[in-house]
Amino acid sequence: MKKRVAGWYRRMKIKDKLFVFLSLIMAVSFLFVYSGVQYAFHVYDEQIYRKSSEVLRMSSERIEDELKKIEDVSYEIITDEQIQRILSMQNRDDTYDQYQMKQELWDQLAGYASDEKYIDSIHVIDARGSEYSAGSSSSDLLQQEQEEVFKRAKAKSGRNLWMTLGGSDPVLISARQIRSYHQLSLNGLGMVLIQVNVKQMIRDVPKDWGDSVGDIMIADQGGNLVYTAHASAHVPEAAKETLKHPGYDLIKKNGKRYFISYLQSSYQNWSYYNVIPFDQMFAKISFMKTVIGTCFLLFFCVVLLFGRKIANSITEPIEQLVTAMKSVQHSGIEAGVSLSLPEHTQDEAGMLNRHFTVMMKRINELMEENVEKQLIIKETELKALQAQINPHFLYNTLESINWLAKANQQKQISKMVESLGFLLRNSIHMKKDIVTIQEEADIVRHYMTIQRFRFEERLKFTLDIDDEVKHCLIPKLTLQPLAENAIQYALEPFTRPCAIRIQAKKAKGCVCITVEDNGPGMDGRILESTGGRGIGLWNIRERISLTFGEPYGLRIHSEHEKGTRIVITIPCRNEVV
């Protein structure tokens, strides 16, 4: 399978590879971005869940604070000295006094009712069953269930009792038995009932907490609803089944999803529920998820479209170049020269086309030049063959003179002819640029032999070559021009004798060659030129540097009336590197 995929990938065109590569990058990027967004939304959801639970806790605390205030009001009522006195005197028959006491009691209750915002009404019922009430509204349920309330409140012996009356629309009341504290008799004087406006209380609690507050529901220890909003009255049972411990969860009821946070308060052991429709709480988040996913998919498609176009723009010049190469392969160089490739782009593809066009033109020019050069070479070789007739004729003539001189016992003439023949043969047959020091010394020796016959006793020549450097390499015609310069500048212009000495030895791992004379000494600038007679010192220095490198070369030491000394330094090598 791996080989098949690798083979399929190798057969793909570059533009397809670029497109696949870009698609993979975008897909991986999409997965990373999607995972990151999902994680971010998950963290955000958790924050919302925690905030909702925190809001429920704060709401419950505020509600319980208000309920405790109402408890305090009921306690103040049952311990109010004037109310105690009025209720204790209800057994009198004085009608005027009773009327006056009723007025005082109503005034007292009205004052207490106005102290707290969430008290709907206050009811005081004396021992004879007479009722005194104050407040904005009163529920008929108090009349209907008065006996049950009395019974349960009496069992509390003056402690506060919270009760809910009714079913679907419950009424919350605070009930206390009023007991006489005169002489600590604790006789029953009546009952105080306070009806609480729970709706307004809960409506005021979450004003500044936004979408984290939904429908708050409260259930007492027995599971009876203390308060519920009409829209979500059907949720508590499902909530109680799902939320066994304080926290939050998502539940589904009647085809709708709800987010519910739950806690149980230590105060009265009441349970608080914050019920939020899922769509209300997470509508914005769901919308953002949809928008982000849609935008990324659109971006993905746009990038792929542009990526395809960019891949085509990159590979199109290359494909045209491949077509041109195939045309050259089948039709020859002329087809490549006549092709017109697009060169308007400045990128590497455009450079390839431009360079290919230039290369085809250059190859065509070189081929044409090569044809011309081959013709010239053929002509030159023919002329060279013709020109070689003269040197060979001269060499053969010199050999004839040499044998004739030997036959007539002319040894000096024979030596001159032999040396001249050696030099002529060396110039004809030796095609090497690098020779051994021994071979170079032989050239100098024969050259100086000829010069001795010319200058006789005036020329004294010494050649001293150590055996360990004889096979070291040196550029051809290095020593002979130096000997020629010495004769030219130290011997020819004067009539006095001149000693020329050439020495070669090994020193510090290198070969040191010295050419010195005892002439009058010359300016180095004069020695640098050849005067049209041979190879200059500058040329020798350059050839040594090019052959062996910069550390090696030639140095000149010349003093007036003391002579000239030229030192050559080359590496001790037996073969060319």
Swiss-Prot record:
Q: Alphabetically, which GO biological process terms does the record hold?
A: signal transduction
Q: InterPro entries in the record, alphabetically?
A: Bact_2-comp_sensor_kinase, dCache_1, HAMP_dom, HATPase_C_sf, His_kinase_dom, Sig_transdc_His_kin-like_C, Sig_transdc_His_kin_internal
Q: Which residues lie on this side of the membrane: Cytoplasmic?
A: 1-17, 308-577
Listed A to Z, the keywords are:
ATP-binding, Cell membrane, Kinase, Membrane, Nucleotide-binding, Phosphoprotein, Transferase, Transmembrane, Transmembrane helix, Two-component regulatory system
Q: List residues of the Histidine kinase domain.
A: 365-574
According to the UniProt record, what class of enzyme is this? transferase
> Would the keyword Metal-binding be found if you checked this record's keyword annotation?
no
Per the record, its GO cellular-component terms are: plasma membrane
Which PROSITE patterns does the record cross-reference, listed alphabetically?
HAMP, HIS_KIN
Concerning CDD domains, the annotation shows:
HAMP (cd06225), HATPase_YpdA-YehU-LytS-like (cd16924)
Task: Tell me any Pfam family this protein matches.
Answer: HAMP
What ranges are annotated Extracellular (topological domains)? 39-286
Cellular compartments annotated:
Cell membrane
Classify the main location.
membrane
Single annotated GO MF: ATP binding
Its membrane topology, per UniProt? Multi-pass membrane protein
Tell me which residues make up the HAMP domain: 312-368
Q: What is this enzyme's catalytic activity, as reactions?
A: ATP + protein L-histidine = ADP + protein N-phospho-L-histidine
Residues that the record marks as modified (Phosphohistidine) are: 392
Q: Which residues cross the membrane?
A: 18-38, 287-307
| Signal sequence coordinates | none
| Enzyme Commission number | 2.7.13.3
PANTHER family with a match to the protein in the record: SENSOR HISTIDINE KINASE YPDA
**What role does this protein play?**
Member of the two-component regulatory system YesM/YesN. Probably activates YesN by phosphorylation.
This one is known as Sensor histidine kinase YesM
Gene it is expressed from: yesM
